[in-house]
Amino acid sequence: MTMDTSPSHDAERGVTDVLLAEPRGFCAGVDRAIEIVERAIRKFGAPIYVRHEIVHNTFVVNDLKAKGAIFIEDLADVPPGATLVFSAHGVSRAVRDEAEARGFSVYDATCPLVTKVHVEVAKLHKEGYEFIMIGHKGHPEVEGTMGQLSEGIYLVEDVDDVAQLRVTRPDRLAVVTQTTLSTDDAAEILAAVKRRFPQVREPKQQDICYATQNRQDAVKVLAPQVDVVVVVGSPTSSNSNRLRELAERLGTPAYMVDSASDLRPEWFEGSARVGLTAGASAPELLVREVIERLRALGAVSVRKMAGVEETVRFPLPLGLGDKSMEGVA
């Protein structure tokens, strides 16, 4: 008896099933950052100025622009006396000092997990440590963390960078990482650092955030069960890009979309089962719109996979909490 290895009827006609990763989408840091901007607009009125995109998502940024947020990169573009919000990615000491010198009313939407890294850098620097930062050059979080010091912090993006690195204090050396990296890539680079600098001090807890870890773990479960993976996220979103790369590394074709309009029917030719996830800065509204588009392409079943339930919630800054907003329309 021979086994029939020809494509199934379902595979021939395209999408039939959609499997949703759990968890996916907004994390606590993104929720908090968006809420800070929205509350600032309600309390102080538009415009509210935000340094850099509050989170890396086109829909979120455009929605906040419509509500009265103005996104800037240079503090010189902020008028005197304005209210300024720092993005979730964090800022350097120089930016913080400039904002104070200009007299802005500042609300800090830096993710508390990024702030934790900044605090650790400041603490160990006082103890004479230099730092290796594992991250992506040019990412605002990396610029913010490296900008906590004027010197003594070195960026490595891959294992080759580690081999070429020269430090001043190999006996007083600590590692920090960008919070949105691939956990596998970060582990590989950290291992190379430890081989090169055996006395290096590792973070007390892994810097890569719980939400990044959970979403990557979910894709590791999702990808082998489907024919193609779709990641909802903007091109500038580091954690969304890592989800797409992870699925591809596991052998499953993967695509990243900013919205449902980016979907292409040809991606799903011969692919009955589609896995769907979203980066930590992508709202669930966009996921629902992608699901509807996949239904239009033939999907008849949409089901959630089992996954970690996230209950983390970060407090808002003083002045924007619930009590301070009483009576604000």
Curated annotation (Swiss-Prot):
Annotated GO MF terms: 4 iron, 4 sulfur cluster binding; 4-hydroxy-3-methylbut-2-enyl diphosphate reductase activity; metal ion binding
Pathway the protein takes part in: Isoprenoid biosynthesis; dimethylallyl diphosphate biosynthesis; dimethylallyl diphosphate from (2E)-4-hydroxy-3-methylbutenyl diphosphate: step 1/1; Isoprenoid biosynthesis; isopentenyl diphosphate biosynthesis via DXP pathway; isopentenyl diphosphate from 1-deoxy-D-xylulose 5-phosphate: step 6/6
Pfam families recorded: LYTB (PF02401)
EC id: 1.17.7.4
Active site: E141
UniProt-annotated binding residues for dimethylallyl diphosphate: H56, H89, H139, S237, S238, N239, S281
Cofactor-binding details, from the entry: Binds 1 [4Fe-4S] cluster per subunit.
Residues annotated to bind isopentenyl diphosphate: H56, H89, H139, S237, S238, N239, S281
HAMAP family: IspH (MF_00191)
Function: Catalyzes the conversion of 1-hydroxy-2-methyl-2-(E)-butenyl 4-diphosphate (HMBPP) into a mixture of isopentenyl diphosphate (IPP) and dimethylallyl diphosphate (DMAPP). Acts in the terminal step of the DOXP/MEP pathway for isoprenoid precursor biosynthesis.
Family the entry assigns: Belongs to the IspH family.
Protein name, entry field: 4-hydroxy-3-methylbut-2-enyl diphosphate reductase
Organism: Methylibium petroleiphilum (strain ATCC BAA-1232 / LMG 22953 / PM1)
